From Swiss-Prot:
Thioesterase that appears to be involved in phospholipid metabolism. Some specific acyl-ACPs could be physiological substrates. Displays acyl-CoA thioesterase activity on malonyl-CoA in vitro, catalyzing the hydrolysis of the thioester bond. Keywords: Cell inner membrane, Cell membrane, Hydrolase, Lipid metabolism, Membrane. Interacts with ACP, PlsB and PssA, forming altogether a complex at the inner membrane. It is found in: Cell inner membrane. Belongs to the 4-hydroxybenzoyl-CoA thioesterase family. GO terms for biological process: lipid metabolic process. This is Acyl-CoA thioester hydrolase YbgC. The keyword Hydrolase applies. Its EC number is 3.1.2.-. SUPFAM superfamilies: Thioesterase/thiol ester dehydrase-isomerase. It is a peripheral membrane protein. The keyword Cell inner membrane applies.
Length: 134
């Protein structure tokens, strides 16, 4: 399996924070989603092209552990890798670190490949399997 770590930078904006002045927990989920999308794009799999092939990914399960907060204007790095691949699913392991490389939280995300018209599982495209099995 291609275990190359994909790194995606993000800055914390006011809209990402809560009344306590720290990043709202759900904002991390959005950061993770964007990083997975950017990882696929980096490997030449755009969401639009995948949809044209009747391929979409839906989150089946997500586990997040929070260790330390991020704050307004912090620069963060979202680290993403595919740690498991099966016939219809991928498991992403993702971490968010700050500029000091402190681990703020980490997630394991199980996504299932579906036909977006039927919303039923389908096999992962051979091109994705080939790209990430290298």
């Amino acid at each position: 399996m291609n275990t190359t770590l994909f790194r995606w930078p993000v800055r914390v904006y006011y809209e990402d924070t809560d009344a306590g002045g720290v990043v709202y927990h759900a904002s991390y989920v959005a950061f993770y989603e964007r990083a997975r999308t950017e990882m696929l794009r980096h490997h030449h799999f755009s969401q639009q092209a995948l949809m044209a092939e009747r391929v979409a990914f839906v989150v089946r399960k997500m586990t997040v552990e929070y260790y330390a907060p991020a704050r307004l204007d912090d620069m963060l790095e979202i680290q993403t890798e595919i740690t498991s691949m099966r016939g219809t699913s991928l498991v992403f392991t993702q971490r968010i670190v700050n500029a000091e490389n402190t681990l703020l939280n980490e997630a394991e995300v199980l996504v299932v490949c579906v036909d977006p018209l039927k919303m039923k599982p389908r096999a992962l495209p051979k091109s994705i399997v080939a790209e990430f099995k290298q």
